[in-house]
Amino acid sequence: MLDTSIQALINKWQKYLVLQRNYSNHTVISYNNDLKHFLEFMNYYNSELVTINHIKTADIRLIRSWLAKRNCDNFAASSISRGLSAVKNFYRFLEKTTQLNSHIIFSIKSPKKTKLLPKALSEDDVVISLEHIEEYGNIKWVELRNKALLVLIYASGLRISEALSITKLHLQNLEFIRIIGKGSKERIIPWLPIAKNLITQYLEILPYKLGDNEPIFRGKQGKKLQPPVFNRELIKLKHFYGLPQHLTAHSFRHSFASHLLEHGADLRSLQALLGHKSLSTTQNYTKTSIKHLEAVYTTAYPIKK
């Protein structure tokens, strides 16, 4: 249970993340859960209901104790790191909106995360997915929606949150899509005719009227389609056709990157298409590509020991 003044601050912070920082709903929900976990621990640590003053005067021992508690509770390093980032983000918001200055939390470094290589699908698995995704909608417009969305993600390398934010205004430009991604970073991606044509066909039979600024991909009740709903469609596809366990909407973004790299795309162009802030993030795909080449070499090279 939180003090009403603290809850009001959290509500303002969430609006700030969405409206000014352009964070996805998924990120905002995760950050909110992390912050509440931190405040619940603070409540336990202080043995009294947390106040604004408790938050402002939280010392390094409390923060390190919270991180240690998460570690003891078997949170992954990535989850602990994200949790600390969420709480730091909240404190930055407090600096902007209250009298708080230079809190000790900013001196704490995040734990090192184990870097996992992105998992791409094979080109054959992508083809199977694109050919059969329409089988799982039960309603014609939903079937076409599923195919249009999946083709869009694979053809453009969009994050699922970015793809689900596409509006009719995006369709008005014949040559490219202008995307506002993580951290309000803008990038421009060429339209592939197959993706645009499928979206146009889908909109022609969509039973809901939409304004130019409304997201075009809708759920069965007419509300904006949410990532978990679409991923459930992919789970059906995965199980029926025996596709890899790591098949999700995001794996098609990874596949877009890996397949372009395997077919000769350069890293700088790939970085621009994916919207990566750092080239080192994009370079992870070269490691995946090298593993692919090693596998091909091992199975196909005519001279073996």
From Swiss-Prot:
Q: Which GO terms describe its cellular component?
A: cytoplasm
Q: Domain (Core-binding (CB)): give its ranges.
A: 4-95
Instruction: Report the active site residues.
Output: R159, K182, H250, R253, H276, Y285
Cite the GO molecular-function annotations of the record. Answer: DNA binding; tyrosine-based site-specific recombinase activity
Give its localization: Cytoplasm
Q: Where are the transmembrane segments?
A: none
A Pfam cross-reference name? Phage_integrase
Question: Which Gene3D superfamilies is this protein grouped with?
Answer: 1.10.150.130, Intergrase catalytic core
GO BP: cell division; chromosome segregation; DNA transposition
Tell me the keywords, alphabetical order.
Answer: Cell cycle, Cell division, Chromosome partition, Cytoplasm, DNA integration, DNA recombination, DNA-binding
Q: Which InterPro entries match?
A: CB (IPR044068), DNA_brk_join_enz (IPR011010), Integrase-like_cat_sf (IPR013762), Integrase_catalytic (IPR002104), Integrase_recombinase_N (IPR010998), Integrase_SAM-like_N (IPR004107), Tyrosine_recombinase_XerC/XerD (IPR023009), Tyrosine_recombinase_XerCD (IPR050090)
Domain Tyr recombinase per the UniProt entry, residue ranges: 116-298
Known function: Site-specific tyrosine recombinase, which acts by catalyzing the cutting and rejoining of the recombining DNA molecules. The XerC-XerD complex is essential to convert dimers of the bacterial chromosome into monomers to permit their segregation at cell division. It also contributes to the segregational stability of plasmids.
Quaternary structure, per UniProt, is: Forms a cyclic heterotetrameric complex composed of two molecules of XerC and two molecules of XerD.
Q: Which family does it belong to?
A: Belongs to the 'phage' integrase family. XerC subfamily.
Entry protein name: Tyrosine recombinase XerC
